[in-house]
From Swiss-Prot:
This is Small ribosomal subunit protein eS24. The keyword Ribosomal protein applies. GO terms for cellular component: ribonucleoprotein complex; ribosome. Disulfide bonds: none annotated. The keyword Ribonucleoprotein applies. Signal peptide: none annotated. Keywords: Ribonucleoprotein, Ribosomal protein. It comes from the Archaea. PANTHER family: 40S RIBOSOMAL PROTEIN S24.
Length: 99
């Protein structure tokens, strides 16, 4: 799996970086969010606790996927802005009992 950063935008108003990337995975299935997040965190020297993978989109018959991640400078701001299902999906918070 190879990740290429295509664009990095700094959103100063919200206090985050928005990262667009492409994943090349010839002969392999679409990589998991956990694997992609780990590689992005290592490549860009980010904090995994404040990095969220918004989406990874694969295209039929292609060995390439596109993705979008957000890196927040402050964890409290991330918890306020990001929807709960995204935080649960990325393993940042636990799902509440009874849901």
């Amino acid at each position: 799996m190879e990740i290429k950063i295509t664009e990095v935008k700094e959103n100063k108003l919200i206090g985050r970086k928005e990262i667009y990337f492409e994943i090349y995975h010839p002969g392999e299935p679409t990589p998991s969010r956990k694997d992609v997040k780990g590689k992005l965190v290592a490549m860009l020297d980010l904090n995994p606790e404040t990095t969220v993978i918004q989406y990874i989109r694969s295209y039929f018959g292609s060995y390439k996927s596109k993705g979008y991640a957000k890196y927040y400078y402050d964890k409290e701001r991330m918890l306020y802005i990001e929807p709960e299902y995204i935080l649960i999906r990325d393993g940042i918070i636990e799902k509440k009992e009874g849901e």
